[in-house]
Amino acid sequence: MTLAPVQPAGTTVEEAVLAVCRRAKVASRPLRLASRATKDAALHAIADAIEAATERIVTANGEDLARGAADGTSPHLLDRLRLDPQRVAAVAAAVREVAALPDPVGEVVRGSTLPNGLRLRQLRVPMGVLGVVYEARPNVTVDVAVLALKSGNAVVLRGGSAAQSSNTVLVEVVRGALESVGLPADAVTSIDEHGRDGVGALLTARGLVDLLVPRGGADLIQRVVREATVPVIETGVGNCHVYVDASADLAQAVEIVLNAKTSRPSVCNAAETVLVHSALAADFLPTLLRALHEAGVVLHADATSLAAARAAGLPAQPVTDEDWAAEFHGLEIAVGVVDSVQDAVEHIARWTSAHTEAVLATDVRVTDYFCAAVDSAVVAVNASTRFTDGGEFGLGAEVGISTQKLHARGPMGLAELTTTTWQVLGDGHVRV
């Protein structure tokens, strides 16, 4: 197995990171030409190698968990960091799912024959080299690597220091699997050892790295957007909203809100704000607040919701602007009462991170208006925000959920990791 090269003595962090990026650039060339069969063989080899290395992976992850617990990391964030044997098996299964997906490379996006007989084809081709910066999610190391490989790209990874032991082993396993099928190990590299200074060098590796994708909290994403000279796709801080309309199926609404908030409260597609129509304030709102409280959710309530909570004997605290803007990463939610779907949309427009918003209503006029008026990557109708996920969308794993409008939006699967090239097919054609 070829391990990622160690920084030579006397080499600066910037020089070391740029050297990694150059090796990735070289490795991207054979990947660009690799057949689907070769890439799929690599992914199956990676899945097999991950399963074979389960004990090593879990042991390394235990080191990360111990450090996190000693540092006071919250239980929800520790859960995101955790890799037990069952989760390792799930990671391997996800790799095989990506192998089974269609290869986007070579897909004809559109084509035509001009009046002069010249034939045009626009084809999907790999980006080249991806740089992905992410936090404390070791499964992302594998997800990103296999999506990059399947779409014909090399990738330079920078995972959070909280998961460094896990990521080191996972990258070693992936690199060894690549070599076993004749692909260059440098198609997947890591700059974790270089810390925050390494991130700075990666962000400015223009000409070597073709696309940067940050995955993590607002501070990380904004640093990448602010400092990068490499093109960036901004991914999702998830301040997701659920609006419960007067026409909603109320039993269904309680279940959806609970799922959106409590099933995995630390992830970016968890709901952070629920807005309830004022016609439901007297009867439904106390029921919803009680259900949230019984699920362990801390309530940040506007004046109407606060009064309803106190009348029902439930603890709640006054909501602040910081709460409306927050991605809580835990069992907390902001609650507000609005007079119409228009008011709900106005609230969302002010506070959203443009990730995912849901409307719960049976009135089609309400759902149609909400879908047309809300400007977010994903809009859900009578469904949980938790469905915003590459796997749930049938895209396989995802590199991230883009909340910007160029070049991709929403969950980023294989197609979103390609660009296009035009082929102009002639027979001695010259322009007159």
UniProtKB/Swiss-Prot annotation:
Enzyme Commission number(s): 1.2.1.41
Short name of one Pfam family: Aldedh
UniProt-listed NCBIfam families: PRK00197.1, proA
Keywords (A to Z) from UniProt: Amino-acid biosynthesis, Cytoplasm, NADP, Oxidoreductase, Proline biosynthesis
Listed pathway(s): Amino-acid biosynthesis; L-proline biosynthesis; L-glutamate 5-semialdehyde from L-glutamate: step 2/2
Molecular function terms, GO-annotated: glutamate-5-semialdehyde dehydrogenase activity; NADP binding
UniProt-recorded name of the protein: Gamma-glutamyl phosphate reductase
UniProt subcellular location: Cytoplasm
Family: Belongs to the gamma-glutamyl phosphate reductase family.
Signal peptide positions (record): none
GO cellular component: a single term: cytoplasm
Catalysed reactions, semicolon-separated: L-glutamate 5-semialdehyde + phosphate + NADP(+) = L-glutamyl 5-phosphate + NADPH + H(+)
GO biological process: L-proline biosynthetic process
Domain of life: Bacteria
Function: Catalyzes the NADPH-dependent reduction of L-glutamate 5-phosphate into L-glutamate 5-semialdehyde and phosphate. The product spontaneously undergoes cyclization to form 1-pyrroline-5-carboxylate.
Species the sequence originates in: Kineococcus radiotolerans (strain ATCC BAA-149 / DSM 14245 / SRS30216)
